[in-house]
A protein has these predicted regions:
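Ubiquitin-like/PB1-type beta-grasp interaction modules and other compact soluble beta-rich domains
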Residues: 689-773
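Basic, polar low-complexity surface loops/patches
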Residues: 1-300, 401
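A generic secondary-structure signal marking the coil-to-beta-strand transition
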Residues: 25, 75-77, 179, 303, ...
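Short, surface-exposed, low-complexity cationic segments
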Residues: 48, 683-686, 764
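Short, well-ordered alpha-helical segments
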Residues: 109, 113, 117, 160, ...
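A short acidic Gly-Thr/Ser loop motif
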Residues: 215, 773-774
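Generic structural marker for isolated residues within well-ordered, non-membrane alpha-helices
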Residues: 163, 209, 590, 661, ...
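Extended C-terminal regions of large enzymes
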Residues: 30, 92-95, 170, 176-180, ...
Length: 774
């Protein structure tokens, strides 16, 4: 069904006015016809899925035609702000959601800076984009005014140049009276690892959102005008102070994130020997990339809209800069190196020695910027064999300008480097590039080639799909570090960390730690009291990072917390369990949601809402063809043991892993194919589409281990039902096309007139084999 037809059906279920206090509108934007429609989501969507990520999934489920390619303009790109975005400390974020062109799963990228808060204060909670614009377009929003602006003058501009041009042409200043979500040349060229930029460093990175936005010929979304404050009611304002104190009073925030940012994570990972190195062939790297080695180049910190933390470390290697912000901030913090406490006091005394990247005294725009985050430090340090802080900083700044996801881009380059090392590809394939580990000159050049899809950059631009697109031989898949077709999001090697590994395997957007990372495993010796862990995770969880026992409870609890956090707009860094067990939790979110929306929430139901959000994501991925077999890990982690560190010899045991995964499915409420079990599935279907048919099968079929299929698309007769069954279970087509299987509706056999036999939501359908006899 065409998206405009799907939208017409959906619009009939939506409202013309807000359904609760502070609700913003959903703006549907038909880029092809330059038309818009403004509606409001039903109250039950907020009650069961919140906003942001959760409500995005509700919209995507109703509008997606999974039989189309991800870059088809009929597949929508959806942005959603959290319900508490701009109204609570550190709630600054929103999600871009679609079907991923980069992976086999959903696209769902979370980001902050100023765009989500500006959008929400201008009266919009969600934007649904579809159709390809007739020419490159800038969507300009200013409260009720919506304009489709010719973006031809901005085509070819990257992240540093574009906002300057917008500021000039519209006489505005980014982060003061303008916010801009935009793509770079990488997005224009549909580079699969291109993100959507929201600031000098802020990026909606994962899953290929930049390519998806480029497929719509949309250069950017501009929110123009000073944001109106969404004035919190008095109880909310008072409790915001409690939340702010929780955040700022937490040790990891106060001593690490506010002072040096996420690079503090490099040392504990290095000491544990859980640091992906040379495409995970090794697991430890140089001390030269410990966070204190960046001190001389750190002039200060920046942050998102009204956030009290300011965790974004800035960098400046130019001659007149003043570094030293946060110098020695981590010294003596034993929690930062719990497996080798002496390392906590090690300072390297790094001095400024940068004289331009060619050591010729020449500097350019890439010698200063924002970042790096730990992800970029790991992906463009140990993963590709780079050991110099200055080289990492410069690569970080180039990535930010080019709008490339550092996780996927770094992993794609590391994959290519290992293939080059093994002789699977040669300089004939790379266009003469020497892809030896640590070859900085080749790596910098390759980034620009990737954004333009030039030469071997065209291969890197295809990210994890390079084999599928004919760029590498099938043998290359043995060395691809992906789950569900998405490269790993962070630099950790999880062969030691069993909960971490489980989380990466079941994460709904692919191999991504931000869905459910059990961070306390990394520094397990800080919080290893069994009773504490049991209370924290609602189940008995082993304190040993390399144990499989109880880790399903830890992943389940983290997944619920983070899904709720995304859907209210809270930064992951400041959400309980990601960095600390003392940070704001779902109980705090419930208090503020109740105050802001006028709807009563309690902590217990927030946990269930988190489960609902992951449940709808599992349902979406099932529609995209993913099954339990896709909840797995790269071959290397099962077959190759660690060779160094306190856990040398560790790897993932397949039997133990599968048992742990099965337990996770059970505590989550999934069946053995990773799909919500029948009763929960029916409940979710009614909440999402307003339609649910339970079809009982004569026996278990591929994809239907419970002998039941839940149909959640509206069908009116038995023929339409049979077609829906085939769409739901294409792997069982032979059985479902068996004409000897009759249909019974509410116990009554349909013997003739099948084309006109009516079915309705809630009916009980049974497929009954004909019994032959004579």
């Amino acid at each position: 069904m065409a998206i405009r037809d799907k939208l017409a059906q959906l619009a009939a279920r939506l409202h013309d006015a807000p359904q609760y206090n502070s609700q913003g509108a959903v703006l549907f934007v038909d880029l092809e016809h330059r038309a818009t429609l403004k509606k409001y989501l039903p109250l039950e969507v907020m009650r069961n899925f919140l906003g942001g990520r959760g409500a995005n999934m509700w919209l995507l489920y109703n509008l997606l035609d999974e039989e189309r390619a991800a870059l088809d303009p009929e597949v929508p790109l959806i942005f959603g702000t959290g319900i508490l975005t701009s109204s609570m400390p550190s709630a600054t974020r929103g999600n871009f959601t679609s079907m991923s062109p980069e992976s086999d799963a959903i696209l769902d990228a979370n980001g902050g800076d100023y765009f989500p808060s500006f959008l929400r204060t201008h009266g919009y909670d969600h934007i649904v984009l579809y159709g390809q614009a007739p020419s490159w377009t800038l969507l300009k929003l200013a409260y009720e005014n919506i304009e489709f602006v010719d973006a031809a003058p901005y085509v070819g501009m990257d992240n540093l140049a574009l906002p300057k041009a917008i500021e000039r042409d519209f006489q505005c200043v980014e982060r003061e009276d303008m916010a801009l979500a935009r793509i770079t040349t990488a997005g224009e060229n549909q580079v699969l690892c291109a993100g959507i930029m929201g600031g000098i460093k802020a990026i909606w990175a994962r899953g290929g959102g930049g390519a998806k936005m480029g497929s719509l010929k949309l250069k950017g979304i501009m929110v123009h005008g000073t944001p109106r404050e969404l004035q919190p009611v008095e109880p909310m304002a008072r409790y915001n102070k409690v939340i702010g104190k929780k955040i700022i009073g937490t040790s990891v925030i106060k001593n690490a994130l506010k002072m040096v940012g996420t690079p503090f994570l490099y040392k504990p990972s290095r000491v544990l020997c859980a640091l992906g190195t040379k495409n995970h062939q090794e697991t430890s790297w140089k001390e030269s990339l410990d966070a204190d080695n960046f001190d001389p180049y750190r002039p200060g910190m920046d942050g998102c809209y009204l956030c009290p933390v300011h965790c974004r470390n800035q960098n400046d290697m130019t001659p007149d800069s003043q570094g030293g912000w946060g110098a020695a901030a981590l010294k003596g913090l034993t929690g930062n190196a719990s497996y080798d406490k002496a390392q906590a006091s090690v300072e390297h005394g790094k001095q400024r020695n940068y004289n331009g990247i060619l050591n010729d005294g020449k500097y350019d725009q890439y010698d200063k910027g924002d970042g790096p985050e730990y992800v970029t430090l790991g992906k463009f340090g140990p993963l590709i064999g780079i050991a110099e802080p200055e080289q990492v900083l410069r690569l970080n700044n180039i990535l930010n300008d080019l709008g490339l996801d550092s996780a996927s881009t770094g992993s794609s380059i590391a994959w290519a480097m290992e293939l080059y090392q093994r002789g699977i590809i040669t300089q004939k394939d790379t266009g003469g590039l020497d892809l030896s580990w640590g070859n900085y000159e080749a790596i910098e050049k390759l980034l620009f080639m990737t954004a333009k899809r030039e030469g071997f950059g065209d291969t890197i631009a295809d990210s994890a799909r390079a084999v599928e697109r004919g760029k590498y031989p099938a043998a290359a898949l043995d060395y691809r570090m992906t789950v569900k077709g998405l490269f790993q999001s962070d630099p950790h090697d999880a062969r030691i960390l069993k909960a971490f590994a489980l989380g990466l395997s079941v994460a709904t957007r692919g191999m991504d730690h931000l869905r459910n990372r059990v961070t306390l495993e990394i520094n397990a010796r800080i919080n290893d009291d069994p009773a504490f862990k049991t209370a924290l995770y609602n189940g008995v969880v082993s304190a040993a990072p390399n144990s499989y026992e109880g880790k399903e409870y830890a992943v389940r609890k983290c997944e619920n917390n983070y899904a709720v956090g995304d859907s209210v707009g809270m930064c992951r860094f400041n959400t309980k369990l990601f960095n600390s067990p003392t940070l704001p939790d779902t109980g705090d979110f419930a208090v503020q949601l109740s105050s802001l929306t006028g709807q009563a929430f309690v902590e217990a139901e927030m946990d269930e809402i988190g489960r609902n959000i992951s449940g709808i994501e599992h349902m979406l991925n099932f529609r995209l063809g993913l099954r339990a077999k896709d909840d797995t890990l790269p071959r290397r982690w099962f077959e190759e043991a660690l060779t160094e560190g306190p856990f040398a010899g560790e790897k993932i045991d397949r039997k133990e892993f599968e048992a742990m995964k099965a337990r996770f499915y059970t505590v989550t409420g999934l069946n053995s194919e990773g799909l919500p079990a029948t009763d929960w599935h029916e409940k979710l279907s009614r909440l999402i589409t307003g339609f649910s048919l339970r079809v009982e099968l004569p026996r278990p079929l591929p994809g239907a281990p419970e002998q039941i299929v839940v149909i959640d698309e509206t069908v009116g007769d038995v023929t339409a039902l049979r077609q829906a069954l085939l769409r739901k279970l294409p792997e069982a087509a032979a059985e479902l096309n068996d004409k000897s299987w009759n249909v019974a509706v509410n116990g009554a056999m349909v013997l003739s007139g099948e084309l006109t036999a009516r079915v309705s939501s809630g009916d009980r359908i049974t497929l009954v084999p004909i019994i032959a006899g004579g």
